[in-house]
Each structure stands twice: as structure tokens, then as C-alpha cells.
Design a protein with these regions (language model features):
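Acyl-thioester-dependent acyl-group transfer interface
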Residues: 1, 47, 56, 79-209
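Short amphipathic alpha-helices and their capping loops
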Residues: 1-44
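Generic intrinsically disordered, low-complexity segments enriched for polar/acidic and small residues
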Residues: 9-13, 66, 203-206
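Gly/Ser/Thr-rich phosphate-binding loops and adjoining beta-strand/alpha-helix segments
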Residues: 31-100
Length: 209
């Protein structure tokens, strides 16, 4: 059974291992989506329903998972809005990864990282199959315990940095905002496939489908 301590434990802290500094690969700037700025705190949500069986069948015809298939579809959809000039930069998606699949934990806290599949469209010569294959190769290469551990360590190292750890909250917020803006230049959009969500039976009577 899960204890309250297990549920409140920090998965990052449990699996963090200090490593020697390694040079980070410099990532190229990604294509940025433009739109009308909305009021602070407001969101625009678009909902759609897709028959899962049909989606699964389409993914299967390419020999990939539904997540890989949908990631490729999203990349191509963004490309359709781009001009030839904008094709000078790749389209890159941030795809969250549930670290519980690699590092067992009962924590109820956030415990995820991400990978960044992308595609550099050039002149519209690419077929959808090319994009699917590139995305699938990225998933296979990045979704390993070794790669996830490195990303996790890089992320948590900031939290335990001796300067930031004891810095005032105001300074931390400034550093976080600067880091967020820098990270945004490497990514075009975020895509998250939550997959099948199973709730405890005791919650079922309170959930409406």
C-alpha cells in the first residue's frame, strides 16, 4: 500500500545523481507561431473528438504508435501555415514524458520530463511518411532510461544549485522567466498525449463521461 510519505515524495530528488558538467548541445532556433495576444490569464481551448479505432488503424498503417502518428500530423499541420521563408527554421514540438514509466515511484507530485521531436521542412518536397519516420526515430532514440536520466539530472540540478537554492523568491522568479523565454525559442509548440487515464474505482461514481 502507498503511504502518504510515498505520495508526497519528490521523484526528481529520489533519482537525482550529481554528474560532471557536460557540454550541452546548442539547439537551433525553431519556427515560432504568431497570433493575437490574449488577456493575461485567458486561454482559448479547441475540443475535438476522434474515433480511437480509426486513429489506431491509421497509425498502424505506418507501423508507429498513435502518439508518434499524432506528433507527425501536428508538425505537418503547422507547416501548412508557414511561408517558404519561414521554412528556414525547423518545426519543433515539446512532448512531455511520464518519468514513472522509467523510474518507479508512488509520488503524486509532478514527475515528468520531455523530448523535442521536430522536422525541418524545405520547399514542400517532403512526404508525410518522411515526417513519420523522422519522428519515430526521435522517439526511439530519446525514450530510453539513460537519456531520461540525463534530462532529469539537468532539470533538477537547477533546483539544487547552491546560489539559486538560497536565493530570494523574487530572484528565482526572474531566473525562471529568463530560462523560460530562452527555452521557448527552441520549441514551436507543445503536444501532450495523456493516453488512457484510469481512476481508482472509488472515484468512478463521481466521474461523468
Amino acid at each position: 500500500s502507498e503511504s502518504l510519505f510515498d505520495q508526497e515524495a519528490d521523484g526528481f530528488e529520489r533519482y537525482y545523481s550529481r554528474q560532471a558538467d557536460r557540454k550541452k548541445e546548442k539547439k537551433p532556433a525553431a519556427h515560432q507561431l504568431r497570433g493575437n495576444r490574449r488577456e493575461l490569464g485567458s486561454l482559448q481551448t479547441t475540443e475535438a473528438e476522434i474515433p480511437v479505432e480509426e486513429l489506431r488503424h491509421q497509425a498502424k498503417t505506418y507501423g508507429v504508435s498513435m502518439t508518434v502518428f499524432l506528433t507527425a500530423v501536428y508538425l505537418c499541420a503547422i507547416h501548412r501555415t508557414m511561408t517558404r521563408r519561414q521554412e528556414s527554421k525547423p518545426v519543433v514540438l515539446m512532448v512531455p514524458v511520464n518519468l514513472r514509466n522509467f523510474f518507479p515511484t508512488n509520488t503524486m507530485l509532478n514527475f515528468f520530463n520531455w523530448i523535442e521531436p521536430g522536422y525541418h521542412f524545405q520547399g514542400g518536397k517532403e512526404e508525410f511518411t518522411d515526417v513519420v519516420q523522422k519522428v519515430n526515430a526521435c522517439f526511439k532514440e530519446e525514450l530510453t532510461a539513460e537519456k531520461m536520466e540525463k534530462r532529469m539530472n539537468d532539470y533538477f540540478a537547477l533546483q539544487v544549485h547552491p546560489i539559486l537554492k538560497f536565493a530570494p523568491l523574487e530572484l528565482k522568479n526572474v531566473c525562471i522567466n529568463i530560462g523560460a523565454r530562452t527555452a521557448e525559442s527552441d520549441v514551436t509548440a507543445i503536444f501532450s498525449n495523456m493516453g488512457i487515464i484510469r481512476m481508482p474505482e472509488s472515484y468512478e461514481t463521481y466521474i461523468r463521461y
